[in-house]
Amino acid sequence: LNYAIEDSWDEKEFDKNSQIVQKLLLHAASAKNVPFSVCKATSFGHKHLFKKINAQQPLTDCEKLAHERVINRFRECCKVAKAHDVGLLIDAEEYNMQFAVDQIVMDLMNEFNTSKAVVYNTVQLYLVDGNERLQQMHSRATTESFHLGLKLVRGAYMQKERKRAQKLGLTSTICKTKSDTDANFNQAVAYC
């Protein structure tokens, strides 16, 4: 079950989104053929917060509290997922937010994926550094002894990523061709 809300704007809406995901997890637990519920990190917190963390900029006291609330929203969903043996898949975000999301999700995996994978992250292989990220996640899971839950995808934000790189005069974060993306994806599948 997928709760496809992203880009919410206020704390009440973020709380409501977390409650909806928890209800979807309970529904998935009662449905034999629904092993996962899916949500977006941006349904639990402001995009600007993820972007700021991703850019490793210092957070204000208010932003630190907002970040804690984001983590707590995720944590409540993870508790429901673990209690009812249903997977919670965190869908991918744009590149300028994804590292911040990865940090949260990996910390939650460390907390909830002790006996099996319950929390899952998404690795986008259209990103040039997709396999490097995958290997870093695997290394951390091995070092810290938790089960790594992953969904491998080619990617979803190609036009946005190209436009962002051009606008900012940056090297593109995505592979140049579909065949490069396919090679990245195949390498990731072989690694797993």
How does the language model describe each region?
Residues 2-192:
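Positively charged, amphipathic and often flexible ligand-engagement surfaces
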